[in-house]
Design a protein with these regions (language model features):
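Sec-dependent signal peptide recognition
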Residues: 1-3
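Boundary at the C-terminal end of the N-terminal hydrophobic targeting segment
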Residues: 12-16
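PEST-like low-complexity, intrinsically disordered acidic/proline/serine-rich tracts
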Residues: 19-139
C-alpha cells in the first residue's frame, strides 16, 4: 500500500511551480511565432522579438494544458510559425526572455486570454498580474 501511495504522488512531484515567473508584473511583446507546442502538462510557444538594442531574441512562453486552453477558444491550429502576434506575459524573474502566458492578440485583432490556475487571475492561489496601467513594454 505504501508503494502505491508513493507512485500516486510522483506526478505531483514532477510538476514544477510557477515561482520562476513574476506574477506581479506583466510585459507585452510583439513579434513572430517561431514554434508552437500543443502538449501536456503545458503548451508553449516561442516568439522572435526585436529588443531595444535592435537584436532579435527568442522569448519562450509557457501556457496552460491544452484542455484548459480549449475552454477559452484555443485550438491546435490557433497559432503557427510565421504568425505576427502581440503577447502579454508575466516575465521570468531572472530577466531572461520568457514568461507565463496571460493573453495574445493575433494579427486579425482576435484576443485570447488564458484559463485555469494563474491564467485568468481567478484562482486565489495565484496572485493577479499588475493592472494594465502598470504594464511595461518589452526590453
Amino acid at each position: 500500500f505504501a508503494a502505491l501511495a508513493l507512485f500516486a504522488a510522483l506526478p505531483v512531484l514532477a510538476h514544477h511551480s510557477g515561482a520562476m515567473f513574476d506574477s506581479e508584473k506583466t510585459v507585452t511583446i510583439s513579434g513572430t511565432i517561431t514554434e508552437f507546442n500543443w502538449t501536456n502538462p503545458h503548451s508553449s510557444f516561442k516568439v522572435a522579438v526585436t529588443n531595444a538594442a535592435g537584436k532579435e531574441e527568442i522569448w519562450a512562453i509557457e501556457m496552460n494544458a491544452p484542455q484548459n486552453l480549449m475552454r477559452s477558444g484555443w485550438k491546435r491550429t490557433t497559432i503557427k510559425s510565421g504568425d505576427k502576434v502581440s503577447v502579454l506575459v508575466s516575465p521570468l524573474r531572472d530577466g531572461k526572455p520568457g514568461g507565463s502566458y496571460r493573453s495574445i492578440t493575433l494579427a486579425d485583432g482576435t484576443k485570447l486570454d488564458g484559463t485555469g490556475p494563474g491564467q485568468n487571475n481567478s484562482d486565489p492561489a495565484y496572485p493577479a498580474a499588475a493592472s494594465p496601467a502598470a504594464t511595461t513594454p518589452a526590453r
